[in-house]
């Protein structure tokens, strides 16, 4: 505890450099971060080297991104996000998680995804969340308890999914206020972001929205309904004016790959004030899913190249949940780095894999992590030595079939339960077709 307090004091001292003269003192800040992080396996040495390399190249796009954060985001918000994300969730939280992973011999996540509600004011084509219905909610006290339990395990990063989380925006802001040492990110369709909510975000300083965007107006409104794109632009304008950080969430499909990976799209994001873009591969989850929306192998290869191109050239941080598996050792679900708790309290291994043998209303968070299904993940990860084939459903469907059968996990889709066989059968052909591309890309990136 004493060591943690010293680190917090060190960060506070370091951040004063940024407040006084941010552009000139970034290197001093990183020197402080190096001292606080120390040495050893939990010191984020590789990540710190990357940041130093960015600071050594002020002409680079990533340096420009750092400047955007400093210039475009409220200084107190930057300070809070820096402290809660980099200090609490990473430098302090990670070593505690590693210790507990060894102590309990199970996965301890870095982040928890929560569905405050299954309610949503839109009905998007192919959306898996619609399978839950619209009447389920985790109470404020249940959400609060999950966060309290998470913090005991060293977890300070919480991500809201849904449904539309902002249906519960008053509770979400209250949780931000109560857990001021945590960082909260929320996926949202942006239709409920108004000036009052933006002011609340500015007040609590630890809430970051990730707005769902499908591409240009035609692509977006085609999946989310006429007028949705206009509401997204209105929300982005408001957030930028309030100097609040935000990003986008992009589900890439066979229909929109070109639209959401073009230079025009990336430049539009930067112009609107977007700081990060989180890409997700369309998953055929649910009985009403549309398998035809799954990208072809050539489209997925194109997304692999385009997201990396964006990271090399644009002042925007792009992440691909599926194609960046090579950077995180494959599948991160099952509590290895994150888990998902739906609005019914069911603890799923992944936001895309709706099977569970535990409910947070009946077990503690740690007990859920030690359940048969989560231990099956723990014992079988990685599911493929090629981390461009990370998922036990999409690229290795036999793995999910086996784990669900062995643990007798049940479908958590409330309205229309889907068997693991039905789900995985939609992925068999895809997995077979993707394998040659994955092997080619993996071999090219591991030539040495």
Named regions from a protein language model:
Residues 1-49, 53, 221-334, 343-344, ...:
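Radical SAM enzyme [4Fe-4S]-AdoMet core and its adjacent flexible, acidic
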Residues 2-24, 28-31, 39-43, 352-448:
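Flexible mid-to-C-terminal extensions adjoining Fe-S/redox cofactors in radical SAM and related proteins
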Residues 32-196:
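Conserved alpha-helical substructure of the radical SAM core
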Residues 88-109, 319, 325, 359-375:
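Short, charged low-complexity linear segments at domain edges
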Residues 120, 124-127, 331, 345, ...:
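Short cysteine clusters
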Residues 130-134, 216-219, 284-287:
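A short, flexible beta-alpha/helix-coil linker loop
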Residues 140-160, 166-280:
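Radical SAM/AdoMet-radical enzyme domain recognition
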């Amino acid at each position: 505890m004493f060591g943690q307090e010293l680190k917090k004091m060190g960060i506070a001292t370091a951040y004063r450099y940024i407040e006084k003269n941010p552009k000139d003192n970034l290197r001093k800040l990183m020197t402080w971060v190096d001292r606080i992080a120390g040495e050893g396996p939990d010191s984020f040495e590789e990540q710190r080297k990357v940041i130093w390399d960015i600071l050594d190249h002020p002409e680079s796009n990533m340096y420009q991104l750092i400047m955007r954060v400093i210039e475009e985001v409220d200084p107190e918000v930057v300070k809070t996000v820096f402290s809660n994300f980099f200090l609490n969730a990473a430098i302090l939280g990670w070593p505690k998680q590693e210790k507990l992973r060894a102590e309990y011999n199970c996965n301890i996540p870095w982040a928890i995804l929560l569905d405050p509600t299954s309610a949503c004011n839109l009905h998007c084509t192919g959306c898996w969340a619609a399978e839950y219905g619209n009447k389920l909610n985790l109470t404020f006290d249940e959400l609060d308890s999950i966060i309290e339990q998470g913090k005991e395990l060293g977890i300070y990063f919480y991500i809201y999914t849904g449904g539309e989380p902002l249906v519960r925006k008053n509770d979400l802001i209250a949780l931000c206020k109560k857990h001021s040492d945590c960082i909260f990110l929320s996926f949202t369709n942006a239709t409920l972001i108004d000036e009052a909510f933006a002011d609340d975000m500015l007040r609590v300083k630890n809430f970051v929205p990730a707005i769902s965007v499908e591409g240009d107006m035609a692509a977006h409104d085609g999946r989310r309904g006429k007028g949705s794109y206009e509401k997204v632009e209105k929300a982005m304008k408001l957030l930028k004016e309030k100097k609040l950080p935000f990003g986008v969430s992009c589900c890439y499909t066979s229909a929109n790959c070109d639209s959401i990976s073009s230079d025009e799209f990336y430049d539009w994001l930067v112009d609107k004030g977007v700081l990060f873009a989180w890409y997700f591969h369309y998953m055929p989850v649910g009985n009403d899913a549309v398998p035809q929306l799954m990208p072809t192998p050539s489209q997925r290869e194109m997304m692999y190249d385009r997201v990396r191109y964006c990271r090399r050239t644009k002042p925007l941080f792009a992440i691909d949940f599926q194609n960046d598996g090579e950077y995180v050792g494959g599948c991160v679900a099952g509590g290895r780095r994150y888990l998902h708790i739906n609005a019914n309290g069911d603890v799923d291994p992944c936001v895309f894999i709706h099977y569970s043998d535990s409910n947070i209303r009946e077990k503690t968070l740690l007990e859920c992590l030690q359940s048969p299904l989560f231990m099956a993940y723990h014992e079988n990860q990685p599911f493929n030595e090629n981390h461009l084939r990370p998922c036990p459903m999409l690229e290795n469907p036999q793995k999910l079939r086996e784990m669900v059968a062995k643990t007798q996990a049940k479908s958590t889709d409330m309205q229309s339960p889907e068997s693991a066989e039905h789900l995985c059968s939609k992925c068999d052909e895809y997995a077979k077709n993707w394998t040659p591309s994955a092997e080619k890309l993996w071999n090219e990136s591991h030539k040495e």
